[in-house]
Amino acid sequence: MTTVIDGKNVAASVIQTVKSATAALEKSSGVTTGLAVVIVGDDPASHAYVGSKGRMAKECGFKSVQHTLPADTKQEDLAALVAALNADPSIHGILVQLPLPKPLDSEAIIQSILPEKDVDGLSVVNAGKLATGDLKTGLVSCTPAGAMVFVRRTHGEDLSGLNAVVIGRSNLFGKPMAQLLLNANATVTIAHSRTKNLAEVCRNADILVAAVGRPEMVRADWVKPGATVIDVGINRVAAPERGEGKTRLVGDVAFEEVSAVASTITPVPGGVGPMTIAMLMANTVIAAHRTAGQTPPQF
Protein backbone atom coordinates (compact mmCIF):
# COMPACT_ATOMS: atom_id res chain seq x y z
CA MET A 1 0.00 0.00 0.00
CA THR A 2 1.51 3.32 -1.06
CA THR A 3 1.68 6.12 1.49
CA VAL A 4 0.73 9.50 0.02
CA ILE A 5 2.31 12.20 2.19
CA ASP A 6 -0.15 14.91 3.22
CA GLY A 7 1.99 18.06 3.04
CA LYS A 8 -0.68 20.17 4.74
CA ASN A 9 -0.71 17.85 7.76
CA VAL A 10 3.07 17.77 8.07
CA ALA A 11 3.24 21.57 7.63
CA ALA A 12 0.60 21.96 10.38
CA SER A 13 2.73 19.87 12.75
CA VAL A 14 5.78 22.05 11.96
CA ILE A 15 3.72 25.18 12.65
CA GLN A 16 2.57 23.67 15.97
CA THR A 17 6.22 23.23 16.99
CA VAL A 18 6.95 26.81 15.87
CA LYS A 19 4.07 28.17 17.99
CA SER A 20 5.22 26.25 21.09
CA ALA A 21 8.84 27.34 20.61
CA THR A 22 7.80 30.98 20.05
CA ALA A 23 5.75 31.03 23.25
CA ALA A 24 8.50 29.25 25.24
CA LEU A 25 11.17 31.71 24.05
CA GLU A 26 9.01 34.69 24.99
CA LYS A 27 8.37 33.20 28.43
CA SER A 28 11.98 32.23 29.16
CA SER A 29 13.82 35.27 27.80
CA GLY A 30 11.20 37.91 26.93
CA VAL A 31 12.10 37.72 23.23
CA THR A 32 9.28 38.04 20.69
CA THR A 33 10.27 36.42 17.39
CA GLY A 34 10.30 39.10 14.66
CA LEU A 35 9.92 38.65 10.89
CA ALA A 36 10.20 41.50 8.37
CA VAL A 37 8.94 40.98 4.81
CA VAL A 38 9.90 43.43 2.07
CA ILE A 39 7.91 43.60 -1.17
CA VAL A 40 8.63 45.92 -4.10
CA GLY A 41 6.05 46.71 -6.77
CA ASP A 42 2.52 45.42 -7.28
CA ASP A 43 2.83 41.92 -8.75
CA PRO A 44 -0.42 40.17 -7.63
CA ALA A 45 1.20 36.74 -7.14
CA SER A 46 3.96 38.24 -4.97
CA HIS A 47 1.39 40.13 -2.88
CA ALA A 48 -0.61 36.92 -2.39
CA TYR A 49 2.52 35.08 -1.20
CA VAL A 50 3.51 37.90 1.13
CA GLY A 51 -0.02 38.08 2.55
CA SER A 52 -0.02 34.39 3.41
CA LYS A 53 3.45 34.65 4.97
CA GLY A 54 2.35 37.60 7.11
CA ARG A 55 -0.81 35.82 8.26
CA MET A 56 1.13 32.70 9.18
CA ALA A 57 3.73 34.74 11.10
CA LYS A 58 0.98 36.38 13.18
CA GLU A 59 -0.63 32.98 13.77
CA CYS A 60 2.72 31.72 15.10
CA GLY A 61 2.88 34.61 17.57
CA PHE A 62 5.60 36.55 15.76
CA LYS A 63 5.99 40.29 15.48
CA SER A 64 5.30 40.54 11.74
CA VAL A 65 6.31 43.67 9.81
CA GLN A 66 5.65 44.28 6.11
CA HIS A 67 7.43 46.96 4.08
CA THR A 68 5.69 47.65 0.75
CA LEU A 69 7.74 49.77 -1.65
CA PRO A 70 6.75 51.20 -5.07
CA ALA A 71 7.98 49.51 -8.27
CA ASP A 72 10.26 52.47 -9.07
CA THR A 73 12.19 52.13 -5.78
CA LYS A 74 15.91 52.83 -6.25
CA GLN A 75 18.54 50.20 -5.44
CA GLU A 76 20.13 52.36 -2.74
CA ASP A 77 16.77 52.94 -0.99
CA LEU A 78 16.05 49.21 -0.88
CA ALA A 79 19.60 48.56 0.34
CA ALA A 80 19.13 51.18 3.08
CA LEU A 81 15.92 49.47 4.26
CA VAL A 82 17.67 46.09 4.46
CA ALA A 83 20.57 47.71 6.37
CA ALA A 84 18.08 49.20 8.86
CA LEU A 85 16.41 45.80 9.34
CA ASN A 86 19.83 44.16 9.78
CA ALA A 87 20.51 46.63 12.61
CA ASP A 88 17.08 46.19 14.27
CA PRO A 89 17.44 43.77 17.23
CA SER A 90 13.69 43.06 17.29
CA ILE A 91 13.85 41.53 13.78
CA HIS A 92 15.24 37.97 13.59
CA GLY A 93 14.26 37.14 10.02
CA ILE A 94 14.34 39.27 6.86
CA LEU A 95 12.65 38.13 3.67
CA VAL A 96 12.79 40.08 0.41
CA GLN A 97 10.05 38.79 -1.90
CA LEU A 98 11.43 37.75 -5.29
CA PRO A 99 11.42 38.51 -8.15
CA LEU A 100 12.23 42.20 -7.74
CA PRO A 101 11.10 44.55 -10.53
CA LYS A 102 13.75 45.46 -13.10
CA PRO A 103 16.28 47.07 -13.01
CA LEU A 104 16.81 46.19 -9.31
CA ASP A 105 19.71 43.81 -8.62
CA SER A 106 18.16 41.12 -6.44
CA GLU A 107 21.42 39.22 -5.88
CA ALA A 108 23.11 42.24 -4.28
CA ILE A 109 20.09 42.76 -1.99
CA ILE A 110 19.85 39.09 -0.95
CA GLN A 111 23.58 38.93 -0.17
CA SER A 112 23.32 42.12 1.92
CA ILE A 113 20.94 40.44 4.40
CA LEU A 114 22.84 39.31 7.51
CA PRO A 115 23.32 35.52 7.18
CA GLU A 116 21.84 34.96 10.65
CA LYS A 117 18.65 36.80 9.54
CA ASP A 118 18.53 35.24 6.05
CA VAL A 119 15.50 33.03 6.71
CA ASP A 120 15.14 32.20 3.00
CA GLY A 121 18.57 30.55 3.26
CA LEU A 122 19.78 32.19 0.04
CA SER A 123 23.00 33.91 1.16
CA VAL A 124 26.32 32.48 0.00
CA VAL A 125 27.33 32.22 3.67
CA ASN A 126 24.39 29.95 4.47
CA ALA A 127 24.99 27.94 1.27
CA GLY A 128 28.63 27.55 2.33
CA LYS A 129 27.70 26.47 5.85
CA LEU A 130 25.39 23.81 4.43
CA ALA A 131 28.14 22.67 2.03
CA THR A 132 30.56 22.23 4.94
CA GLY A 133 27.95 20.44 7.05
CA ASP A 134 27.39 23.29 9.51
CA LEU A 135 23.70 22.92 10.33
CA LYS A 136 24.23 24.37 13.82
CA THR A 137 24.72 28.00 12.77
CA GLY A 138 23.46 28.12 9.15
CA LEU A 139 19.90 28.51 7.84
CA VAL A 140 18.70 26.15 5.11
CA SER A 141 16.64 27.19 2.08
CA CYS A 142 12.97 26.54 2.91
CA THR A 143 11.86 24.15 0.14
CA PRO A 144 14.73 21.64 0.52
CA ALA A 145 14.41 21.92 4.32
CA GLY A 146 10.71 21.03 3.97
CA ALA A 147 11.39 18.13 1.61
CA MET A 148 13.96 16.85 4.10
CA VAL A 149 11.32 16.78 6.86
CA PHE A 150 9.38 14.29 4.70
CA VAL A 151 12.53 12.19 4.21
CA ARG A 152 13.33 12.13 7.94
CA ARG A 153 9.76 11.23 8.88
CA THR A 154 9.86 8.34 6.40
CA HIS A 155 13.40 7.01 6.93
CA GLY A 156 14.61 8.52 10.24
CA GLU A 157 17.61 10.78 10.89
CA ASP A 158 20.30 8.44 9.53
CA LEU A 159 20.13 7.53 5.84
CA SER A 160 23.22 5.28 5.90
CA GLY A 161 23.12 2.67 3.14
CA LEU A 162 20.37 4.42 1.16
CA ASN A 163 20.89 5.70 -2.38
CA ALA A 164 19.36 9.12 -3.10
CA VAL A 165 19.00 10.71 -6.53
CA VAL A 166 18.17 14.41 -6.90
CA ILE A 167 17.07 15.40 -10.42
CA GLY A 168 17.96 19.09 -10.73
CA ARG A 169 21.10 21.04 -9.81
CA SER A 170 19.73 24.52 -9.08
CA ASN A 171 21.24 26.63 -6.31
CA LEU A 172 17.72 27.16 -4.97
CA PHE A 173 16.82 23.51 -4.56
CA GLY A 174 18.90 20.76 -6.16
CA LYS A 175 22.28 21.52 -4.61
CA PRO A 176 21.02 22.21 -1.05
CA MET A 177 18.76 19.12 -1.20
CA ALA A 178 21.73 16.96 -2.19
CA GLN A 179 23.80 18.45 0.66
CA LEU A 180 21.07 17.73 3.21
CA LEU A 181 20.82 14.11 2.05
CA LEU A 182 24.61 13.78 2.14
CA ASN A 183 24.77 15.24 5.65
CA ALA A 184 22.28 12.53 6.70
CA ASN A 185 24.69 9.86 5.32
CA ALA A 186 22.83 8.97 2.11
CA THR A 187 24.85 8.09 -0.99
CA VAL A 188 23.83 10.94 -3.29
CA THR A 189 23.73 11.36 -7.07
CA ILE A 190 22.78 14.69 -8.65
CA ALA A 191 21.21 14.20 -12.08
CA HIS A 192 20.39 16.99 -14.54
CA SER A 193 19.65 17.83 -18.18
CA ARG A 194 23.07 16.56 -19.32
CA THR A 195 22.85 13.23 -17.45
CA LYS A 196 23.03 10.16 -19.69
CA ASN A 197 20.63 7.26 -19.09
CA LEU A 198 18.59 9.29 -16.61
CA ALA A 199 15.93 6.59 -16.16
CA GLU A 200 18.63 4.06 -15.29
CA VAL A 201 20.21 6.42 -12.75
CA CYS A 202 16.82 7.00 -11.12
CA ARG A 203 16.05 3.27 -10.88
CA ASN A 204 18.92 2.97 -8.41
CA ALA A 205 17.32 5.42 -5.96
CA ASP A 206 15.78 4.46 -2.63
CA ILE A 207 14.94 8.18 -2.33
CA LEU A 208 14.14 9.99 -5.58
CA VAL A 209 13.68 13.77 -5.56
CA ALA A 210 12.47 15.46 -8.75
CA ALA A 211 12.91 19.22 -9.21
CA VAL A 212 13.34 20.18 -12.86
CA GLY A 213 10.05 21.76 -13.94
CA ARG A 214 9.18 19.18 -16.61
CA PRO A 215 5.57 17.96 -16.30
CA GLU A 216 5.25 14.27 -15.39
CA MET A 217 8.74 13.46 -16.65
CA VAL A 218 9.40 10.71 -14.10
CA ARG A 219 7.52 7.59 -15.19
CA ALA A 220 6.81 4.34 -13.35
CA ASP A 221 9.65 2.48 -15.08
CA TRP A 222 12.13 5.07 -13.73
CA VAL A 223 11.30 4.17 -10.14
CA LYS A 224 12.70 1.36 -7.99
CA PRO A 225 9.82 -0.61 -6.40
CA GLY A 226 9.35 0.56 -2.81
CA ALA A 227 11.22 3.86 -3.28
CA THR A 228 10.32 7.16 -1.62
CA VAL A 229 9.49 9.77 -4.28
CA ILE A 230 9.52 13.50 -3.44
CA ASP A 231 8.03 15.66 -6.21
CA VAL A 232 9.10 19.30 -6.04
CA GLY A 233 7.95 20.25 -9.54
CA ILE A 234 4.93 22.49 -10.03
CA ASN A 235 3.73 22.80 -13.60
CA ARG A 236 0.51 24.13 -15.10
CA VAL A 237 -0.71 22.02 -18.02
CA ALA A 238 -3.76 22.20 -20.27
CA ALA A 239 -6.80 20.31 -18.95
CA PRO A 240 -9.33 20.29 -21.82
CA GLU A 241 -11.41 17.71 -19.91
CA ARG A 242 -12.22 20.52 -17.44
CA GLY A 243 -13.40 22.82 -20.19
CA GLU A 244 -11.91 25.09 -22.81
CA GLY A 245 -8.83 26.97 -21.66
CA LYS A 246 -8.75 25.19 -18.27
CA THR A 247 -5.51 24.03 -16.67
CA ARG A 248 -4.39 21.79 -13.83
CA LEU A 249 -1.29 21.56 -11.66
CA VAL A 250 1.01 18.58 -12.01
CA GLY A 251 4.45 17.76 -10.67
CA ASP A 252 7.58 16.42 -12.34
CA VAL A 253 6.37 12.89 -11.50
CA ALA A 254 3.56 11.01 -13.28
CA PHE A 255 1.69 10.57 -10.00
CA GLU A 256 -0.90 7.94 -10.94
CA GLU A 257 1.52 5.45 -12.44
CA VAL A 258 4.44 6.09 -10.06
CA SER A 259 2.25 5.73 -6.96
CA ALA A 260 1.64 2.12 -8.05
CA VAL A 261 5.40 1.44 -7.71
CA ALA A 262 6.67 3.74 -4.94
CA SER A 263 6.11 3.00 -1.24
CA THR A 264 5.87 6.70 -0.33
CA ILE A 265 5.10 9.65 -2.62
CA THR A 266 4.25 13.35 -2.36
CA PRO A 267 1.34 14.68 -4.44
CA VAL A 268 1.19 17.94 -6.42
CA PRO A 269 -0.48 20.09 -5.25
CA GLY A 270 -0.53 19.42 -1.48
CA GLY A 271 2.92 17.89 -1.01
CA VAL A 272 6.10 19.96 -0.77
CA GLY A 273 4.27 23.27 -1.45
CA PRO A 274 2.69 23.79 2.01
CA MET A 275 6.06 23.04 3.65
CA THR A 276 7.82 26.07 2.18
CA ILE A 277 6.01 28.67 4.31
CA ALA A 278 6.12 26.34 7.34
CA MET A 279 9.92 26.09 7.08
CA LEU A 280 10.18 29.87 6.67
CA MET A 281 8.47 30.15 10.07
CA ALA A 282 10.75 27.41 11.44
CA ASN A 283 13.88 29.25 10.24
CA THR A 284 12.64 32.49 11.83
CA VAL A 285 12.07 30.94 15.26
CA ILE A 286 15.43 29.12 14.98
CA ALA A 287 17.12 32.48 14.26
CA ALA A 288 15.37 34.08 17.26
CA HIS A 289 16.53 31.28 19.58
CA ARG A 290 20.13 31.62 18.39
CA THR A 291 20.07 35.39 18.93
CA ALA A 292 18.77 34.84 22.47
CA GLY A 293 21.45 32.21 23.15
CA GLN A 294 18.84 29.45 23.48
CA THR A 295 18.82 25.98 21.92
CA PRO A 296 16.53 26.13 18.86
CA PRO A 297 13.77 23.56 18.24
CA GLN A 298 14.31 20.60 15.89
CA PHE A 299 12.05 20.04 12.89
From Swiss-Prot:
Report the domain of life of the source organism: Bacteria
* GO terms for cellular component: cytosol
One molecular function GO term is:
methenyltetrahydrofolate cyclohydrolase activity
What catalytic reaction does the record list?
A: (6R)-5,10-methylene-5,6,7,8-tetrahydrofolate + NADP(+) = (6R)-5,10-methenyltetrahydrofolate + NADPH; (6R)-5,10-methenyltetrahydrofolate + H2O = (6R)-10-formyltetrahydrofolate + H(+)
Kindly list the biological process annotations in GO that this record carries: L-histidine biosynthetic process; methionine biosynthetic process; purine nucleotide biosynthetic process; tetrahydrofolate interconversion
> Which stretches are annotated as coiled coil?
none
Q: What are the protein's UniProt keywords?
A: Amino-acid biosynthesis, Histidine biosynthesis, Hydrolase, Methionine biosynthesis, Multifunctional enzyme, NADP, One-carbon metabolism, Oxidoreductase, Purine biosynthesis
Keyword check for Zinc, yes or no: no
Return the EC number. Answer: 1.5.1.5, 3.5.4.9
Q: Which InterPro entries match?
A: Aminoacid_DH-like_N_sf, NAD(P)-bd_dom_sf, THF_DH/CycHdrlase, THF_DH/CycHdrlase_cat_dom, THF_DH/CycHdrlase_CS, THF_DH/CycHdrlase_NAD-bd_dom
Q: In which pathway does it act?
A: One-carbon metabolism; tetrahydrofolate interconversion
- Binding locations of NADP(+): 168-170, 193, 234
Which purpose does this protein serve, as stated in its record? Catalyzes the oxidation of 5,10-methylenetetrahydrofolate to 5,10-methenyltetrahydrofolate and then the hydrolysis of 5,10-methenyltetrahydrofolate to 10-formyltetrahydrofolate.
The record's subunit annotation is: Homodimer.
The family this protein is said to belong to: Belongs to the tetrahydrofolate dehydrogenase/cyclohydrolase family.
State what protein this is by name: Bifunctional protein FolD
| The organism of origin for this protein | Rhizobium leguminosarum bv. trifolii
Top-level taxonomy: Bacteria, Pseudomonadati, Pseudomonadota, Alphaproteobacteria, Hyphomicrobiales
